[in-house]
Amino acid sequence: MIDIDDVAAINPELVQLLPLRPKDSLPLQENVTIPKQKRKSVNSKIPGPKEGLRSRSTRISTVSEVRIPAQENEMEVELPVSTNSRKPFPIHTGHPRPSCSTVTELPLLMISEEAEEQAHSTRSTSSANPGNSVRRKSCIVKEMEKMKNKREEKRAQNSEIRIKRAQEYDNSFPNWEFARMIKEFRVTMDCNPLTVTDPIEEHRICVCVRKRPLNKQELAKKEIDVISVPSKCLLLVHEPKLKVDLTKYLENQAFCFDFAFDETASNEVVYRFTARPLVQTIFEGGKATCFAYGQTGSGKTHTMGGDLSGKSQNASKGIYAMASRDVFLLKNQPRYRSLNLEVYVTFFEIYNGKVFELLNKKAKLRVLEDSKQQVQVVGLQEYLVTCADDVIKMINMGSACRTSGQTFANSNSSRSHACFQILLRAKGRLHGKFSLVDLAGNERGADTSSADRQTRMEGAEINKSLLALKESIRALGQNKAHTPFRESKLTQVLRDSFIGENSRTCMIAMISPGISSCEYTLNTLRYADRVKELSPHSGPSGEQAVQMETEEMDASSHGASLTGNEEEELSSQMSSFNEAMTQIRELEERAMEELREIIQQGPSWLELSEMTDQPDYDLETFVNKAESALTQQAKQAKHFSALQEVIKALRLAMQLEEQASKQINSKKRHQ
């Protein structure tokens, strides 16, 4: 029998207890010292039989099971084990087999109790402080945290970008966001503007567009430029828009024309590509016409007549004078010198459907059609000129007499169509004619309806004549058999320019670049586009809309569009307004005709009264004239009756026009 006390006496380190310390867990191994106490393990110096060794191994394994509860609570400890402790005990076969029944198990039981107490205290600490335990996060939680961090970083970046952009632009005016969007869009454009060296293409109908620079008033209001001219035939309008959720964006509309001139183009460049090719036509026996069309204040008079300084004008830098100089240059060339051509000029205006001569104290003229269906302007005088300087004098004289008025866009706006004609005559016979027309500013009916009756009548007549002009040019371009030139006085006077094989026309559409004129600019471009109907990408449409959105939010709105019902109601009111204007114009003409008849056939009562003032007047003569006057008076009763009916109808038409105008103004105020 081996006594355990003897073994302990020989190897005291086998039963020596050490303090516990937590450490990383290791896999359980047999023949290792118990995990809850730190003790040195050495090989026993007392040999024993194999049964005793197996009994000890079993006993040690039993004690090692105390570690399991501690592992479940994530508190792991490890006792350092010497290298020798992992080796098996040496077994001496010469000794008898020891018995394990007499070995006392008190130290092992004490070790087991301490391990259980330690495990119990660990469980209590974990349950009392659940936050101290380290828990692994799931993959979903980690991904959500990553997304949150990315969103915060993106917001911070956007905030920095907004602050930087706000520093680059002046926030004192409300349209700086649109200015930034337009600037960013222009950076992406490939610009190839028109140059003087570009070839000149000849067209029977040439439609061009010219953009003027921002004027002093627009710069003072801090307006932005919404027009871009990326190429020699393409023009873009950056129309500001506002969504329902107050998101601002641009609708970029493209228009294609034969030539597009930006704000840097001079009058000389515009003339080179527009009116200059037409000068050759009149020397070949043809008729040529050049129009300047556009909104009030868009630069029509500057282009046609020259530089303006208040009401004075430098006519030498306008298309009128440039065309005159080229006419005299061609006239003196050898190929045309033998024709013995003489140059004449006329200058008249059409105001409110009436024709007035600008070179003869604004004498009123009549437009009639003779038996050969040729339109004649009765009383219009032609002035012979021998050089370009004479022409410039005539232009200055006529421009000073032109009818003008004040509008919302121009304090000195031309309210009439001015027509300057250069005629070539050979032995009194008309050889060619070049008509240069400075059209009145186009107005919306809704804008003119709020003014007085005179201004409303001006606007109605201007729009009527411009519509007739557009249809006449389209008929010329499409070679239609019928040309609606009788629709207005303007097309009547220019009738011979729309018929015949050798007729050419050029239209210069003038536009304003400011954001406040965007709607009027689009109306001008659509008018010019329908004259010829070119597509920006060789398609059937003349417009292409490309939207560029930005996430800028603002409560200010550029403008609200009308609903379908409101547009229909306003359209019906405008139709009534235009019908009333047409009736007024027709009745006015009838009243003038009746009055002329009465004046021509009626007696001169003033002459009879003056006759009686003479001391030696002939009484017989007086009686004869009085009887004749009374007879004529009876015959003219029907003319008086007709005039009375016309005046009543004219009064009714004026009342209808006034009522329609008030309805339109009321509708505009409610909007």
From Swiss-Prot:
Free-text domain note: The microtubule tip localization signal (MtLS) motif; mediates interaction with MAPRE1 and targeting to the growing microtubule plus ends.
Coarse class of the protein's main subcellular location: cytoplasm
Organism of provenance: Rattus norvegicus (Rat)
PTM: Phosphorylation by AURKB, regulates association with centromeres and kinetochores and the microtubule depolymerization activity.
Protein name per Swiss-Prot or TrEMBL: Kinesin-like protein KIF2C
Keyword Ubl conjugation among record annotations: yes
One example of a Gene Ontology biological process annotation: cell division
GO molecular function per UniProt: ATP binding; ATP hydrolysis activity; microtubule binding; microtubule motor activity; microtubule plus-end binding
Compartment(s): Cytoplasm, Cytoskeleton; Nucleus; Chromosome, Centromere; Chromosome, Centromere, Kinetochore
